[in-house]
């Protein structure tokens, strides 16, 4: 029997934003150039202004592309949590553990009527909900997206996706500017693009009554990381978008700003640099946007297409509902069909936790619950 959460009418989520806690990084991890997990910050990149006029299609034929069709579950995030808990000797206090991408989908739901989603969730040790993307749904959605793209005019979807990674390559250095050879800086346009390396931030944040542990990739840092854990970090999110030529383009861009804002808001990223490009992928502008100013900017236009406070209030209310309905073990499916006015929740496995939780994580949590060993 499925429980249903009504998205409509979204007017009930209007009003002042429910309380939110500033995201604080308490751990991080990296994937190297081969996408191997590393429990460190070795893949951190540093922002450096890109050269305008660059062709974002250049290097597409040598693109070292990550195959992300496999199901990695929450494994890397859980490994990082285990290492943190081993260091502190206590369990993190979050009651939701998930990837930033899952929370982005949830927060965008009131104003994103076209995209559906499927997630798997499980309860472990009474309180926390661990939520992952349903991989089969992700793969099928991408296949449909590719089929739809073949029917539209313009560059292939794969090329347009590459433009975003090319912009990241043009806008980042592997070390601070003072430590980077001039030859490397001037040769960025010829660098082989590789999206396998990633730096992932793990933060504690809060929306309404829920305390969240989120993991997500950050593209670059503006200056350097502060020594003290939990201090604000000058992260930079990098995006590409078609240049704005008319009112319709501006409306489309304001719609895109919703996900830009949510993604950055959830990890505490204060700055977004948008690379505006021509229709055939030539970089014409790099615009610096402060994350906290996006909601007021969008609201300054007539008939704004989304509202930040409503996104927060929707997420807070939905997470409360989820907590009240996921009350025992097993694997639960969180499902929204495209254009559906409801989100469904139902069990797909009566017992256990599926593959959402790794054996390493479960064994560690059992050991932690038993307390200090009496072995001498």
UniProtKB/Swiss-Prot annotation:
Where in the cell?
Nucleus
Q: Which reaction does it catalyse?
A: a 5'-end NAD(+)-phospho-ribonucleoside in mRNA + H2O = a 5'-end phospho-ribonucleoside in mRNA + NAD(+) + H(+); a 5'-end (N(7)-methyl 5'-triphosphoguanosine)-ribonucleoside-ribonucleotide in mRNA + H2O = a (N(7)-methyl 5'-triphosphoguanosine)-nucleoside + a 5'-end phospho-ribonucleoside in mRNA + H(+); a 5'-end triphospho-ribonucleoside in mRNA + H2O = a 5'-end phospho-ribonucleoside in mRNA + diphosphate + H(+)
Cofactor dependency: a divalent metal cation
At which positions is a divalent metal cation bound? 168, 219, 237-238
Assigned keywords, A-Z: Hydrolase, Metal-binding, mRNA processing, Nuclease, Nucleotide-binding, Nucleus, RNA-binding
Q: Where does substrate bind?
A: 200, 217, 239, 263
By sequence similarity, the record places it as follows: Belongs to the DXO/Dom3Z family.
Q: What is this protein called?
A: Decapping nuclease RAI1
Q: Which organism is it from?
A: Gibberella zeae (strain ATCC MYA-4620 / CBS 123657 / FGSC 9075 / NRRL 31084 / PH-1)
């Amino acid at each position: 029997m499925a429980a249903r959460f009504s998205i409509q009418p979204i007017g009930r989520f209007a009003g002042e934003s429910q309380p939110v806690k500033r995201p604080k990084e308490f751990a991080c991890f990296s994937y190297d150039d081969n996408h191997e997990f590393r429990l460190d910050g070795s893949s951190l990149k540093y922002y450096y202004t890109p050269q305008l006029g660059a062709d974002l299609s250049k290097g597409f034929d040598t693109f070292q592309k990550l195959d992300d069709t496999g199901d990695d579950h929450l494994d890397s995030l859980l490994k990082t949590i285990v290492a943190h808990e081993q260091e502190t000797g206590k369990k993190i206090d979050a009651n939701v553990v998930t990837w930033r991408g899952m929370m982005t989908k949830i927060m965008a739901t009131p104003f994103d009527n076209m995209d559906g989603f499927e997630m798997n969730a499980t309860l472990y040790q009474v309180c926390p909900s661990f939520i992952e993307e349903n991989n089969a749904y992700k793969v099928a959605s991408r296949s449909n997206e590719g089929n739809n793209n073949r029917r539209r005019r313009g560059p292939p979807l794969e090329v347009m996706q590459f433009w975003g990674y090319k912009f990241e390559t043009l806008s980042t250095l592997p070390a601070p500017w003072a430590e980077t050879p001039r030859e490397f800086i001037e040769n960025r346009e010829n660098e082989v693009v590789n999206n396998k390396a990633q730096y992932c931030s793990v933060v504690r944040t809060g929306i309404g009554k829920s305390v969240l542990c989120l993991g997500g990739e950050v593209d670059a840092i503006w200056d350097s990381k502060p020594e003290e854990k939990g201090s604000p970090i000058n992260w930079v999110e990098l995006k590409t978008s078609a240049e704005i030529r008319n009112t319709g383009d501006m409306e489309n861009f304001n719609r895109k700003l919703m996900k830009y804002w949510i993604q950055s808001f959830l990890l505490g990223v204060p700055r977004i640099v948008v690379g505006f490009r021509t229709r055939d992928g030539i970089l014409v502008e790099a615009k610096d946007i402060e994350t906290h100013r996006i909601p007021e900017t969008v609201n300054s236009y007539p008939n704004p297409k989304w509202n930040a406070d409503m996104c927060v209030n929707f997420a807070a209310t939905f997470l409360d509902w989820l907590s009240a309905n996921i009350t025992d073990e097993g694997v639960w499916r969180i499902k929204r069909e495209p254009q559906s006015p409801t989100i469904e929740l139902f069990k797909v496995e009566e017992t256990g936790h599926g593959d959402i939780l790794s054996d390493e994580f479960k064994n560690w949590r059992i050991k932690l619950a038993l307390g200090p060993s009496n072995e001498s």
